[in-house]
Amino acid sequence: MKNYHDIVLALAGVCQSAKLVHQLATESRADSDTFLTALNSLFITQPQRIEDVFGGEVRHLKLGLETLIHQLNAQGDQNLTRYWLSLLALEGKLSKNPDAKQTLGNRISRLKEQEIHYARDSETMLSIMANIYSDIISPLGKKIHILGSPDYLRQELVQNKIRAVLLAGIRSAVLWKQMGGTKWQILFFRRKLLATAKQIYSSIY
């Protein structure tokens, strides 16, 4: 039997990354706590439970749950839809590429070693995360075309933040697959996913 609670949390993580990408591309900034939740998820590789990946509490996925609920209600922004579905598609490519998976694991291990020297949200760490995405994930499939302000999208720091958040989105997409998530569920069990997302969201308050 599928654990829809965990599937929805992982999918909310994907949607949260998509929303952060949109914020960064259109405003050059994102909610700081939610941004850190995304970055921190890259460092939690052996969680005891799914909540551990997102700071140990469901409330850290509030923005992602809101975004997922709007998306499942067909009320969401089309760019957001494209972003999170593209992340799921890239995860599918990654799962079929053993070399890419191994390289990704090695690069994440080296990333974790840099914590001794740099804060997770430092420009140096963001650059490392962005390079991991560009080197390993981006070549796997069709590049995600990000729409936003050209002035912001030209800034190297904004570019690195977006790629770092996309890498976090891949982390959530991998988790979604591990929890038993499938694209068929999004098509045929949308109401179940929506009801579960609403139930989890209501528990935050």
Curated annotation (Swiss-Prot):
Locations listed in the record: Cytoplasm; Cell inner membrane
Key words, A-Z: Cell inner membrane, Cell membrane, Cytoplasm, Membrane
SUPFAM superfamilies associated with the record: YcfC-like
Domain of life: Bacteria
Keyword Phosphoprotein: no
Cellular component aspect of the GO annotation: cytoplasm; plasma membrane
Record's bilayer topology term: Peripheral membrane protein
InterPro entries the record matches: HflD, HflD-like_sf
Any matching Pfam family: DUF489
Predominant localisation class: cytoplasm
Protein family per UniProt: Belongs to the HflD family.
Protein name per its UniProtKB record: High frequency lysogenization protein HflD homolog
Species of the source: Haemophilus influenzae (strain PittEE)
